[in-house]
């Protein structure tokens, strides 16, 4: 008699996607981050659901309701700390997942890659509106600055800003709709994840060698399911330790102060995981130019498959020059953003941000395609 998981209409779908999925036998730990992102999404939805039961989206009580959760709700402090720090771990896994896709040429699976970029935008939107909800000083001013960027849109900019705000400033209407978006968007992300997986399983997973692995595949369970469990254990242990011992390490001290529209913080900045994009926004003096560059810094990921000039699937892994350029990109992403953006707008941080922004776009649009073309010429 056939197993129920192979015959039941619903269980058969889950079985083909998780249990009996043919998987390349040589995928490394870098392929764990997809499942870790799924774990982060589930953890964020669950903790967020419990927080939403006690949170009030009213500017008069939002800040005190978060304090109430931490002080009076059973394990509310733990749930809040796991949710706040879970967002950071979500983005760590997300950026590592994207980096692996770039390094090993997974972007050539165009549908999967483009849905992944849409997922990145959705997660960034979710994190942004969620950051506003505690109604702290940096939350309020961050929302004011970022939403005000819509005023750079020609002709309809001011109307757009007032439409998003629900008035003439960031106020009660803004907080209410941001809470609604923050509750809704994770479920849209979950739906997009399913589409991402459907496209991925149409073509099959990539592997470190970039070769066709149809003749060398093994079932996902038990080989890689147990491997993923190790990743789950490491992630949950690290997240729990951070939430218990240093819960405010990745936060902003200004958010311990209730939002005050009359007092502007000395330096308005977003959470650390948005700094690379904020660095590009701030490096351009013109508002419209900065907004376009900000969007381009994310959407240029969709251009990566189109700018692939190498005859190899994964030039970053196999060619010394493109490998060097890839690690230059990683070097630009990590140290230069916090260095130039966690500081005031003054010399030399402005010029560092501008140089890093030029390097960022040059790598994707010029240097990496040129290196692939040069490699093809060398191999002829």
From Swiss-Prot:
Cofactor: binding comment: Binds 2 heme b groups non-covalently.
Gene Ontology annotations of biological process type: mitochondrial electron transport, ubiquinol to cytochrome c
A cellular component annotation (GO) from this entry: mitochondrial inner membrane
UniProt-recorded Gene Ontology molecular function terms: metal ion binding; ubiquinol-cytochrome-c reductase activity
Annotated localization: Mitochondrion inner membrane
UniProt KW keywords: Electron transport, Heme, Iron, Membrane, Metal-binding, Mitochondrion, Mitochondrion inner membrane, Respiratory chain, Transmembrane, Transmembrane helix, Transport, Ubiquinone
Organism superkingdom: Eukaryota
Topology class, membrane: Multi-pass membrane protein
Sites where the protein binds a ubiquinone: 201
SUPFAM superfamilies: a domain/subunit of cytochrome bc1 complex (Ubiquinol-cytochrome c reductase), Transmembrane di-heme cytochromes
Similarity comment: family membership: Belongs to the cytochrome b family.
Quaternary organization: The cytochrome bc1 complex contains 3 respiratory subunits (MT-CYB, CYC1 and UQCRFS1), 2 core proteins (UQCRC1 and UQCRC2) and probably 6 low-molecular weight proteins.
Protein name: Cytochrome b
């Amino acid at each position: 008699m056939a197993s129920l998981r192979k015959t039941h209409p619903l269980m058969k779908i889950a079985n083909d996607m998780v249990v009996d999925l043919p998987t390349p036998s040589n995928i490394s730990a870098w392929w764990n981050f997809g499942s870790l992102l799924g774990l982060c999404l589930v953890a964020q939805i669950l903790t967020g659901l419990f927080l939403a039961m006690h949170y009030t989206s009213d500017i008069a009580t939002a800040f005190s309701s978060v304090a109430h959760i931490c002080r009076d709700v059973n394990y509310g402090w733990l749930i809040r700390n796991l949710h706040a720090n879970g967002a950071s771990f979500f983005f760590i896994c997300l950026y590592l997942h994207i980096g692996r896709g770039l390094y090993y040429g997974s972007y050539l699976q165009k549908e999967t890659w483009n849905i992944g970029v849409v997922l990145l935008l959705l997660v960034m939107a979710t994190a942004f509106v969620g950051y506003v909800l505690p109604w702290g000083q940096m939350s309020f001013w961050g929302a004011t600055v970022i939403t005000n960027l819509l005023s750079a849109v020609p002709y309809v900019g001011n109307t757009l800003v007032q439409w998003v705000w629900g008035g003439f400033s960031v106020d009660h209407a803004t907080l209410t709709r941001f809470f609604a978006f923050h509750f809704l968007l994770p479920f849209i992300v979950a739906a997009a994840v399913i589409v991402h997986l459907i496209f991925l399983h149409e073509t099959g997973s990539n592997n470190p060698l970039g070769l066709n692995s149809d003749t060398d595949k093994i079932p996902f369970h038990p080989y890689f399911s147990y491997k993923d469990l190790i990743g789950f254990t490491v992630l949950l242990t690290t997240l729990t330790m951070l939430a218990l011992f240093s819960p405010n390490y990745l936060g902003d001290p200004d958010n311990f102060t209730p939002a005050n529209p009359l007092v502007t913080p000395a330096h308005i900045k977003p959470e650390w995981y948005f700094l690379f994009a904020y660095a590009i926004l701030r490096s351009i003096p013109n508002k419209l130019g900065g907004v376009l560059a900000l969007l381009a810094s994310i959407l240029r990921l969709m251009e990566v498959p189109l700018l692939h000039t190498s005859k190899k699937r994964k030039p970053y892994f196999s060619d010394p020059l493109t490998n060097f350029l890839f690690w230059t990109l990683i070097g630009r992403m990590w140290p230069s953003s916090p260095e130039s953006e966690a500081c005031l707008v003054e010399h030399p941080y402005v010029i560092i941000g501008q140089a890093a922004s030029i390097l960022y776009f040059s790598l994707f649009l010029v240097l990496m395609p040129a290196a692939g073309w040069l490699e093809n010429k060398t191999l002829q």
